[in-house]
From Swiss-Prot:
Organism: Streptococcus equi subsp. equi (strain 4047)
UniProt protein name: UPF0340 protein SEQ_1951
Family from the record: Belongs to the UPF0340 family.
Lineage: Bacteria, Bacillati, Bacillota, Bacilli, Lactobacillales
Gene3D superfamilies from the UniProt entry: Hypothetical protein TT1679 (3.40.50.10360)
């Protein structure tokens, strides 16, 4: 796999989702990543640290530049816990849990997050404002309600199916109510 092409395609997908999700500075963005799927394999079967590092490093750089906080979801072997910066966990009052990811328990994305983040910690759950799912990892449990599906500009990254979610406030009040404009569904 050409890692330069992978990086550029991941960047294109990410920037599309960041723009259309209307995520703001200081908000949380969740990444679910199966490097096995990116390489054309079955989720959890052929994890690649190299692929995880390329994707996570890129996403962390792009989001950090915009002041958006990245949380990287792990696999079911660690109950889909998330890696993020300790300062973000404190800011959002998230309970830190004790687990260290490995290639087959947490995955390559989490290992990369531990490598590239300044003070990485694990938390059990978040309510992110938006997220990107590379390889059908099921990020929905970590995106706040009301979730709005976004179809990425490119639906595959390598061999992995790519989906995304944004979120918006609930619309309440019924037929007489009026609402603020929806920045996601312009």
């Amino acid at each position: 796999m050409n890692l330069k092409v992978l990086r550029e395609e991941a960047r294109s997908i990410l920037l599309d989702i960041v723009e259309r999700s209307a995520i703001k500075k200081g908000q949380l963005f969740v990444l679910g990543l199966s490097s096995s799927e990116v390489l054309g394999g079955r989720i959890g079967q052929h994890s690649s640290l190299e692929v995880g590092e390329v994707i996570v490093k890129l996403i962390l750089e792009e989001l950090s530049f915009r002041g958006i906080h990245l949380a990287v979801q792990g696999c079911e072997h660690i109950n889909r816990a998330l890696v993020l910066e300790e300062s973000v966990a404190e800011e959002y009052r998230l309970e830190i849990v004790n687990v260290l990811p490995s290639l087959h328990a947490g995955g390559s994305g989490q290992l990369a997050a531990f490598k590239y983040m300044k003070q990485p910690v694990e938390v059990e759950a978040i309510a992110a404002h938006a997220g990107l799912d590379i390889g059908d990892t099921s990020i929905g449990m970590h995106v706040k309600r009301v979730q709005v599906p976004l179809v990425p500009i490119q639906r595959e990254l390598g061999g992995a199916h790519v989906t995304a979610l944004a979120s918006r406030p609930k619309l309440i009040g019924g037929v007489r109510a009026r609402y603020q404009p929806d920045p996601i569904r312009k």
